[in-house]
UniProtKB/Swiss-Prot annotation:
Catalytic activity of the protein: [protein]-peptidylproline (omega=180) = [protein]-peptidylproline (omega=0)
Subcellular localization(s) per the UniProt record: Cytoplasm
Family: Belongs to the FKBP-type PPIase family. Tig subfamily.
Domain observations: Consists of 3 domains; the N-terminus binds the ribosome, the middle domain has PPIase activity, while the C-terminus has intrinsic chaperone activity on its own.
Top EC class for this record: isomerase
Lineage per the UniProt record: Bacteria, Pseudomonadati, Chlamydiota, Chlamydiia, Parachlamydiales
Principal location listed in the UniProt entry: cytoplasm
Name of the featured protein: Trigger factor
Organism of provenance: Protochlamydia amoebophila (strain UWE25)
Key words of the record: Cell cycle, Cell division, Chaperone, Cytoplasm, Isomerase, Rotamase
Length: 435
């Protein structure tokens, strides 16, 4: 076997029967330009002749025993077609073995272009197909992560957490004789005023304060009577700035106004949530907030880890992978928007966002699975059960990543993948260099 570099992006490999020029394109596209030697085509032609001989019936001869000349006279075109098929299949298989390139299952394969196939000249044909992605090996020690400073729980966060407990036991009385004031509770609709208006909040009850409403909605509802509406432009979140934020027009409608009667903050309130004293309630709330702060730091570490994996270990993805996964995500996103039957005005922006998210998700999936394979990381049944408990605990908050009522085999696969991802990321965090 010989191996020779040719033009940029191309390489030639050969054996006794054929030469293969390999050209790699974007999205794992591979082109095989294959030249087969005459001797190999002669062998393929003889094989094709025997195959056709066994398939046909010629009066006066047993099947498979007819003279070759007679077969060629009557079925010469069939023999030639069978010969071409054999040369294509054999040449392609030999090329795969020589190059160690594997076609992608269910990937795009173009129809072969056959330039010629004769016993005198040999054969020359071109095949283009999607190959499996080549996943680079990850070296965990090459990852450099920064420790995030611990975040202190603020008094405002403690107050908001306590307010959430109070709201569970708040009673409401309608207000009908005045407009909205700060501190009231209201039921509101919020509609984004696109070409086709899109309702994003439907009759939701919230308090008119900083924790209940963003300032740009709060300033519009104060002074409105029940049934009245106001319009404005959305504004960015000052605490969490988004460089891609774009202001859009909206309409807010106050459906009803309520006075909220909150319970006293005492031991009786604590008992309603399964505790004994109000001091114990404060302690539990503080512990929960501290745990959430730690989880936020962990999420930042994971996000930084994922960014480094994408940056340090780039690789190409098959277009069919991207398209199929993007379409599934796009359909889900439009369904959540309630616009699966009509495309939103900013459809192209949404499609690009989904495509970028899809590519990132696929790259991370393959890199993490490569880490698992290289380091023999597996998940036990106990770890799958623990993942189920974690996901069930997240259901009330809406953060669970499983469909508990879905297909049982798919649920098992979801839990296994979540547990494996968790294990791989912990392994990488433990092995990375921290600064």
């Amino acid at each position: 076997m010989s191996n020779q570099e040719t033009e940029a992006g191309s390489k030639t490999i050969s054996n006794d029967n054929l030469n293969v020029q390999i050209t790699r394109g974007t999205h794992c596209q591979v082109k095989f330009d294959i030249t087969v030697k005459p001797e190999a085509v002669v062998a393929a032609y003889q094989k094709a002749l025997k195959t056709i001989n066994k398939e046909i019936n010629i009066p006066g001869f047993r099947k498979g025993k007819a003279p070759q000349q007679l077969i060629l006279e009557k079925y010469g075109s069939n023999v030639q077609k069978e010969c071409v098929d054999i040369v294509l299949q054999t040449g392609f298989n030999d090329a795969l073995q020589l190059t160690h390139i594997h076609p992608l299952k269910d990937g795009h394969i173009k129809r072969p272009i056959v330039h010629y196939c004769t016993q005198e000249k040999g054969a020359h044909f071109v095949l283009e197909f999607e190959a499996r992605p080549t996943i680079p090996s990850v070296q965990p020690q090459e990852l450099h992560l920064h420790h995030q400073a611990p975040v202190q729980v603020t008094d405002e966060e403690r107050k908001n957490a306590l307010d959430q407990v109070l709201l569970q036991f708040t009673t409401y009385q309608p207000i009908e004789d005045r407009p909205v004031q700060e501190g009231d509770f209201i039921n509101v609709d919020v509609t984004i005023l696109e070409e086709t208006p899109r309702l994003i909040i439907d009759n939701q009850r919230t308090q008119v304060n900083q924790s209940g409403l963003p300032s740009w909605i709060q300033e519009k509802v104060i002074g409105l009577n029940a049934g009245a509406s106001a319009e404005g432009m959305t504004q960015p979140n000052e605490k969490f700035p988004d460089p891609d934020f774009k202001s859009v027009p909206f309409r807010v409608t106050v459906k009803t106004i309520w006075q909220g009667n909150m319970p006293a903050i005492d031991d009786e309130l604590a008992k309603k949530v399964g505790l004994q004293t109000v001091d114990e309630l404060y302690q539990k709330l503080n512990e929960r907030l501290e745990q959430e702060a730690q989880e936020d730091i962990y999420k930042q570490h994971i996000h930084h880890l994922e960014d480094q994996l994408i940056e340090k270990y780039p690789f190409d993805l098959p277009l069919s992978y991207i398209e199929s996964n993007k379409q599934a995500r796009l359909d889900d996103y439009l369904k959540q928007l309630g616009q699966e039957s009509q495309l939103p005005q900013n459809y192209e922006e949404i499609e690009k966002m989904i495509e970028n998210s899809t590519i990132r998700g696929l790259q991370l999936y393959f890199l993490l699975r490569r880490v698992a394979a290289d380091n023999k990381l597996e998940v036990s049944e106990e770890e799958v059960s623990q993942e189920l408990s974690k996901q069930i605990a997240l259901i009330p908050s809406g953060k669970s990543q499983i469909d508990i009522y879905g297909d049982k085999s798919k649920l098992r696969e979801q839990l296994y993948n979540l547990a494996l991802d968790r294990k791989i990321k912990k392994f990488l965090l433990d092995q990375a260099q921290w600064v």
